């Protein structure tokens, strides 16, 4: 679990997302409250439930990006899913309980990796021993006394020399034959609606087939060391302990990001079949968000303390179109702002992995130096903003379309211009995009 303060979390998010200070603060405080709750004494700790967040804002302003970056910072079980994937129980499609099942799978994988890192050093030593046993088989006993001791000393000295060479990577490309444990057979079974639990049991039954069998393989020492380290680390793990920790981690620290929640609202009150299904998904989500117990293959999982962050553009609907019970489960509401020309400029150059840096790095692989003048950046931002205003407003995603069109010729002919420099100024931008951006009909299809 992350121990970062809200200010540190916001600072990390600022490296990748421009603006949206209110949304960043809300998720930073929510994430910090997870840690604060763990410091509270037990009787009161159970009573402190997370305050779920509803993020409202137009498409392309950073809602999903905040979730993606938060997942990396959280150091906790985190899942991002689209609400549109789910249907009411009884309809064809996934039911909402699968959210928790997917989250527990993520947690088990996360917990297993954490536990394996703890024993990695010891597992590496054991893996090295197994490789050295193949390279230097133990000599037969030659008798007793001084001669046997001398042979053992020689063997140990040779073994240490080879271990040193192995650690320095001098033997990486040498091939050896090893008995390597086969991974369990993977089998995917399509689950009929409402029968996910039974399908999960069948899948786990088949997954045990073939596990534990060994196969003789010829591999390079570099690969052998990795395979044997993983095998030795897995032997040291207690699977039951991993499962218990994973379930506890989900229950206490789990975070679910529900994207596109506005798409399951009732947009009118005519009560068509689609409306019934959408309301049904909301009703199914309600106990999950409120706190319930879900049966998974790793045991029962309580959702009382899982944090839910929902987001939606709410173009055609309003948050008040959600059923009242669900509205009440998202007490913190944050509105994200539409992007301005200044924001577009910052997105192009100010973030850690900005679009400009990405394209410069891509073309540098062909020895083409791409330079952006300040007036070129400004003009590019103005065109993206203007096209958004005249056509559909898709936020920062418009920049991808505009910059792709701008660099179309440069990217195509990069191989012929090795060693050259290309400067993108306002005149270049106008030449490449001017006509297209002015013609509204054309910009609808091209930009």
Swiss-Prot record:
GO biological process: protein unfolding; proteolysis involved in protein catabolic process
Keywords for the protein's UniProt record, in alphabetical order: ATP-binding, Chaperone, Cytoplasm, Nucleotide-binding, Stress response
Superkingdom of the organism of origin: Bacteria
Residue ranges of coiled coil: none
Family: Belongs to the ClpX chaperone family. HslU subfamily.
InterPro entries assigned to the protein according to its UniProt record, in alphabetical order: AAA+_ATPase, ATP-dep_Clp_protease_ClpX, ATPase_AAA_core, Clp_ATPase_C, HslU, P-loop_NTPase
Keyword set includes Membrane: no
Positions with a binding annotation for ATP: 18, 60-65, 259, 325, 397
Entry protein name: ATP-dependent protease ATPase subunit HslU
Function: ATPase subunit of a proteasome-like degradation complex; this subunit has chaperone activity. The binding of ATP and its subsequent hydrolysis by HslU are essential for unfolding of protein substrates subsequently hydrolyzed by HslV. HslU recognizes the N-terminal part of its protein substrates and unfolds these before they are guided to HslV for hydrolysis.
Subunit structure: A double ring-shaped homohexamer of HslV is capped on each side by a ring-shaped HslU homohexamer. The assembly of the HslU/HslV complex is dependent on binding of ATP.
Organism per entry: Burkholderia mallei (strain SAVP1)
């Amino acid at each position: 679990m992350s121990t970062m303060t809200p200010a540190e979390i916001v600072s990390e998010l600022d490296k990748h997302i421009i603006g949206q200070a209110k949304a960043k603060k809300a998720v930073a405080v929510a994430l910090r409250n997870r840690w604060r709750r763990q410091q509270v004494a037990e009787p009161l700790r159970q009573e402190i439930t997370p305050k779920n967040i509803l993020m409202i804002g137009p498409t392309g302003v950073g809602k999903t990006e905040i979730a993606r970056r938060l997942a990396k910072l959280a150091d906790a079980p985190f899942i991002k899913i689209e609400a549109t994937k789910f249907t009411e129980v009884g309809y064809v499609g996934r039911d909402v309980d699968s959210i928790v099942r997917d989250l527990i799978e993520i947690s088990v994988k996360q917990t297993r990796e954490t536990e394996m890192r703890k024993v990695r050093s010891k597992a590496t030593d054991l893996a090295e021993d197994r490789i050295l046993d193949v390279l230097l088989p133990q000599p037969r006993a030659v008798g007793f006394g001084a001669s046997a001791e001398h042979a053992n000393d020689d063997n140990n000295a040779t073994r240490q020399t080879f271990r040193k060479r192995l650690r320095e990577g001098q033997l990486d490309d040498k091939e050896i034959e090893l008995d390597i444990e086969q991974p369990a057979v993977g089998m995917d079974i399509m689950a009929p609606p409402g029968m996910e639990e039974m399908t999960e049991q069948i899948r786990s039954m088949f997954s045990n087939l073939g596990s534990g069998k060994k196969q003789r393989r010829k591999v390079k020492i570099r690969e052998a060391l990795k395979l044997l380290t993983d095998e030795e680390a897995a032997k040291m793990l207690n699977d039951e302990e991993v499962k218990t920790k994973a379930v506890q981690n989900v229950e206490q620290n789990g975070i679910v990001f529900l994207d596109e929640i506005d798409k399951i609202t009732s947009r009118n009150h005519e009560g068509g079949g689609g409306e019934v299904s959408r309301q049904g998904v909301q009703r199914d989500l309600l106990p999950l968000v409120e706190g319930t117990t879900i049966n998974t293959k790793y045991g029962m999982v309580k959702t009382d303390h899982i944090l839910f962050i929902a987001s939606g553009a709410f173009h055609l609907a309003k948050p008040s179109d959600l059923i009242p019970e669900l509205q009440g489960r998202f007490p913190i509401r944050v509105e994200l702002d539409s992007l301005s020309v200044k924001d577009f400029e910052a997105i192009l150059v100010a973030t850690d992995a900005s679009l400009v840096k990405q394209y410069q790095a891509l073309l540098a692989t062909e020895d083409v130096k791409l330079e952006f003048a300040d007036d070129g950046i400004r003009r590019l931002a103005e065109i993206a903003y203007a096209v958004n205003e005249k056509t559909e407003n898709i936020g920062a995603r418009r920049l991808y379309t505009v910059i792709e069109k701008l660099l179309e010729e440069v990217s195509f002919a990069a191989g012929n211009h090795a060693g050259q420099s290309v400067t993108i100024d306002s005149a270049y931008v106008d030449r490449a995009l001017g006509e297209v951006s002015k013609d509204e009909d054309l910009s609808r299809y091209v930009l």
